[in-house]
C-alpha cells in the first residue's frame, strides 16, 4: 500500500510539474550538481540527471527547476541534451547558466568526439528554460579529461570569466558575446596555502584539499 501511494504521488508530481516543499526538493528524478541562477526575482536550479537504471555516471541531459518562495518548485523538465551538440558523444555533467543582455548561456561539459577527451560547450537561449541551441558547432574549450565543471563570473566592470577544471583550475576571459574568449587559458596554481593541504598520504600531482569546481 505504501509503495502504491508513493507511486501515485510521484506520478501526480510528474504530471503537474510542481514540487512542494520537501527534502530533498527533487524526488521524482535522480539529480545532482545543482547550479543556481537568480533572474527577475526567481531562483532557477540547473541539474544533471542520472538515468534510473544506471550504476555509474549515465548522464544524458540537463534539467531545470524554479521557485519564487523556496517552498514550491516548478519542474521545467529536460532543457538540453548532449545529443544537441553534434561534436559530443556522452557525459552531460555539471553545468552553469548565466544571463547577459537578455540571453541565457549554458556552459556544459561533455565528452568530445573530436579528441576523445573532456570539453566544454556553450548553448544559448532566450529564456531560462530554453530552447537552447549550440551557436558554435564545436567546443568552446577542449584539451584534456579535466575540462569539466564550468562556471561563469561577471565582474563589476562587466568582464566575464569562465572558470573550470578538476583537479586543475583554469580560467579565460570571455568576450562580450559570451561564446568566445580572448587571450590564453590560464592555469591557477593549486597551492596548499590557497586550497588547503590534502588529508592522508601526500600526492605530489594532487597536493591540495579542495580541487573540484565550480569554483565561484
For the regions a language model picked out, list residue spans one by one:
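Bacterial Sec-dependent N-terminal signal peptides
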Residues: 1-22
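Carbohydrate-active catalytic/glycan-binding domains of CAZyme proteins
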Residues: 20-216
